[in-house]
Regions:
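Catalytic cores of enzymes that engage adenine nucleotides and/or redox cofactors via long glycine-rich
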Residues: 142
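Active-site-adjacent structural elements in folded domains
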Residues: 163-174
Length: 183
């Protein structure tokens, strides 16, 4: 998918007025003549758009996770730098018990790590691609003599995405909810 220029897709979409047609046309431009007739066979708009959304989220989660990891590491460094500095902790805006100036930094670093764990789960389990036709039953693949489930699995693996084993026209929103919760 990296060989398809997003600017080319936008250019084609401006001409066609349809995002999926533009993606299919961009795919056809890079495929062999033998493969071109099959670009849209057995796929629906939802197959294309949901897979594209998963790929966008995959890229975004990488950027977000890297930023959070960097911030966590900075906080851990600050925690270590301040571990021997005595400070007064507070509760309800009143002085409480002595602590170190580094403890709050370590606390926030731990909270960020918890968020990273949620992001990692969403990244590894909730980015769903599909290629299953209008009902998710892979009828068109069967007509072509292909194993539709294997086609979908291979397609999604090549993109670094998970796939549903019992798909429908659209995948459930639970997967997107996992990602939103993690964020």
């Amino acid at each position: 998918m990296d060989v398809i220029d997003p600017d080319r897709i936008r250019e084609l979409e401006a001409k066609t007025g349809h995002d999926v047609i533009a993606i299919n046309q961009a795919l056809e431009e890079i495929l062999s003549d033998e493969a071109k007739p099959f670009v849209n066979m057995g796929r629906t708009s939802a197959d294309t758009t949901q897979t594209a959304k998963a790929l966008q989220l995959k890229s975004a989660l990488k950027v977000i996770a890297t930023s959070i990891e960097n911030l966590r590491d900075i906080l851990l460094d600050k925690s270590i730098e301040r571990k021997d500095i005595v400070a007064m902790d507070t509760t309800h805006l009143y002085d409480a018990l002595p602590t170190t100036a580094g403890r709050p930094f370590a606390h926030y670093a731990e909270m960020l790590q918890s968020g990273l764990n949620h992001l990692k789960y969403a990244y590894e389990n909730s980015l769903i691609g599909k290629w299953g036709d209008a009902t998710g039953n892979h009828h068109a693949a069967t007509v072509l003599g292909l194993d539709g489930m294997q086609l979908q699995e291979t397609y999604c693996q090549m993109l670094g995405l998970k796939h549903m084993t019992a798909s429908a026209q659209t995948s459930g929103l639970e997967y997107e909810a996992d990602v939103m919760y993690a964020l």
